[in-house]
Amino acid sequence: MNTAYKLQGIHRHYEWGGNTFIPQLMHVDNAIGKPFAEYWMGAHPSAPAMVETAEGSRALDQMIQEKPEAFLGPKTAAQFGSLPYLFKILDVEKMLSIQVHPSKENAEKGFKKEQIAGLPIDAPHRNYKDQNHKPEVMVALSDFWLLHGFMPAMALKERLTSLAPLHNLLPIFGMDDYAGLYSHFMRLDQSAADAILKPLLALAVE
């Protein structure tokens, strides 16, 4: 295919997004201060980019389905059958939610199960909106703190032992490892979590 098409991405207005960076980047008016969290340029079925053609705008995923080799090339079309990545621009103003990504095998099983159950692809209670395992690459355009994974168990045990505000968590970690500790902390009400975090912040400042 020798034709170049103009793509129009899709804005995602999640609560945690900022309200200036993406509108300024994409020359979009945002006088009301609506959050612009993400800008998607891809073929995800829930929000495919729009392709400007001579016949009007069309969804990128539909065009790929009609002519996969023309849009993806023979090798990618044969291996994936669709665009194998989703390019996003993020403007993170508030803390993001904690995410757990499935393995490729679990993603395929979960997606198939929800498809058979007839759950709409955009249903808010749906877990698997595609059958991919979500490996990610992040390129920071400004200062950005990202927490990824967990330290080794012995290192965390030493940390819980050495920091007085965390001593009460030692028995929980000793009994149920990371799963129990994480579950316990996520179920704390805000005041209880703050009682643990505030002394840690004070130590960090010192």
Regions found by a protein language model. Give the residues of each.
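Transition-metal
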Residues: 1-206
